[in-house]
């Protein structure tokens, strides 16, 4: 990342992170969503996918909601086995493989992290108290949640509403006519952090968060990293 002065455009720093900071801020966004949308007590978390974000999202979520059990679904058995071995040791919890349906049905929080172009999570799998963060659909062709999932949601949160209506899970739900573009249940993540709207209000609500990625988060984490470096006097 290159950090520029907002007034002059003069480069302030070049951070040779090779995508690391973007990966971290993506996981942080998921954890922030869970802070406001997940139940206060999370016993079981679920993850769909076994890649880098599947790891970082669960690490960040565990800080916010220290769950004791993690259910994992992935297409390749060897990738699932490697993930379970790594994450059970890193988090000190029980990690188990499960079918996608069981991941959703048995978890308090589910994070989907795949580049799937076919819906994985189905409406009938949802249950009271569930929170889902979907972060894999960062183009208009990707989709992890069946559009009908949105019918059962009490709260729907986007990182950027206009962007999610263009591509992401919200985009598909709107195109199928399941979700209105000005749906009263839908608002942005920033409104939660600014406390202008309430998050989860009880343990029965079903909540969804659609994360498509936003540049302002890159700016925020780049500035944070730079300020930390300056305090450490390592640059």
Set out the residue ranges of the language-model regions.
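Phosphate/diphosphate ligand-binding glycine-rich loop within oxidoreductases
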Residues: 1-42
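Glycine-rich Rossmann-fold phosphate-binding loop(s) that bind the pyrophosphate
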Residues: 49-51
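Rossmann-like adenosine-cofactor binding region
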Residues: 92-178
């Amino acid at each position: 990342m290159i950090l520029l002065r907002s007034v002059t455009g003069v480069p302030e720093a070049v951070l040779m992170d090779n995508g690391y900071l973007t990966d971290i801020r993506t996981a942080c966004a998921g954890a922030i969503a869970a802070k406001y949308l997940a139940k206060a007590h999370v016993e079981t978390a679920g993850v769909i996918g076994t890649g880098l974000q599947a790891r970082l999202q669960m690490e960040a979520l565990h800080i916010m909601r220290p769950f004791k059990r993690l259910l994992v679904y992935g297409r390749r058995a060897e990738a699932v086995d490697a993930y379970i071995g790594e994450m059970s040791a890193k988090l000190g919890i029980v990690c188990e493989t499960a079918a996608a349906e069981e991941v959703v049905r048995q978890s308090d929080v589910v994070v989907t992290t795949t580049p799937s172009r076919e819906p994985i999570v189905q409406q009938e799998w949802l249950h009271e108290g569930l929170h889902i963060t979907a972060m894999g659909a960062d183009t208009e062709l990707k989709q992890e949640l069946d559009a009908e999932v949105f019918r059962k949601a009490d709260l729907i949160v986007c990182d950027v509403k206009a962007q999610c209506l263009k591509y992401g899970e919200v985009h598909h739900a709107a195109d199928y006519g399941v979700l209105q573009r000005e749906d009263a249940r839908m608002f942005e993540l920033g409104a939660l952090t600014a406390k202008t709207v309430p998050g989860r209000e009880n343990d029965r609500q079903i909540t969804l968060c659609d994360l498509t990625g936003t540049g302002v988060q890159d700016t925020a984490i780049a500035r944070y990293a730079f300020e930390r470096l300056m305090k450490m006097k390592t640059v």
